Amino acid sequence: MAGRGKGKTSGKKAVSRSAKAGLQFPVGRIARYLKKGKYAERIGAGAPVYLAAVLEYLTAEVLELAGNAARDNKKNRIVPRHIQLAIRNDEELGKLLGEVTIASGGVLPNIHAVLLPKKTKGGKGEETA
């Protein structure tokens, strides 16, 4: 009857749900928050994995665009201004986060077309009268 019981059978190392799903975001922590938040009486096993994947994708998308904005401004560090520019210049992210205020984000540079100086017709040397 050797080998029976509840003792450790092998030295397998525990693998997190994040690692199983190939994610960087913590699936276990998100599951805990979903349970603690009382969003529903019960939470399915796949729900925190899916939510972690969605959050990771959105974060990667925003960071990619913010990194591009920082590089365009010849900076090595992403600051809130770069995140603001990234979100507001992207159509889909702008729609998703339209009502969100980003602290120290500033505003998009925009001059209404009516306020711009009028363009004159022709080029140089028109006034030869």
Swiss-Prot record:
Compartment(s): Nucleus; Chromosome
SMART domains, per database record: H2A
Entry superkingdom: Eukaryota
Residue ranges of coiled coil: none
SUPFAM superfamilies: Histone-fold
Keyword field contains Cytoplasm: no
The keyword Kinase appears for this protein: no
Protein name in UniProt: Histone H2A
Species whose genome carries this gene: Chlamydomonas reinhardtii (Chlamydomonas smithii)
